[in-house]
């Protein structure tokens, strides 16, 4: 019987743990293990985010180059539109008469 009593006690020389205390200890151990898993997953997520940020930073020079290209291309249509507007103002009298003559010839 002494052997039976020794096997149920948590540590030799201490009192036996009640069912509640055993269940509480098991739950505490499970919670601690789950916290360790959560911590490991958070660390993995942090490393992944750092890798994504590093890749994004590698493309900053490419992004700057494309932005510069976009700005140049955006200015070109504006300059072209301004040039066309200037040409139309200079040639309004001649262009209108020539267009009407071509249309009249096609309708006859």
From Swiss-Prot:
It is found in: Chromosome, Centromere, Kinetochore; Cytoplasm, Cytoskeleton, Spindle; Nucleus. It comes from the Eukaryota. One of its GO terms (biological process) is mitotic sister chromatid biorientation. One of its GO terms (molecular function) is microtubule plus-end binding. Residues 77-108 are annotated as: Disordered. InterPro entries: DASH_Dad1 (IPR013958). One of its GO terms (cellular component) is mitotic spindle. Residues 77-87 have a biased composition (Basic and acidic residues). Component of the DASH complex consisting of ASK1, DAD1, DAD2, DAD3, DAD4, DAM1, DUO1, HSK3, SPC19 and SPC34, with a stoichiometry of one copy of each subunit per complex. Multiple DASH complexes oligomerize to form a ring that encircles spindle microtubules and organizes the rod-like NDC80 complexes of the outer kinetochore. DASH complex oligomerization strengthens microtubule attachments. On cytoplasmic microtubules, DASH complexes appear to form patches instead of rings. Belongs to the DASH complex DAD1 family. Component of the DASH complex that connects microtubules with kinetochores and couples microtubule depolymerisation to chromosome movement; it is involved in retrieving kinetochores to the spindle poles before their re-orientation on the spindle in early mitosis and allows microtubule depolymerization to pull chromosomes apart and resist detachment during anaphase. This is DASH complex subunit DAD1. The lineage of its organism: Eukaryota, Fungi, Dikarya, Ascomycota, Pezizomycotina. The gene is DAD1.
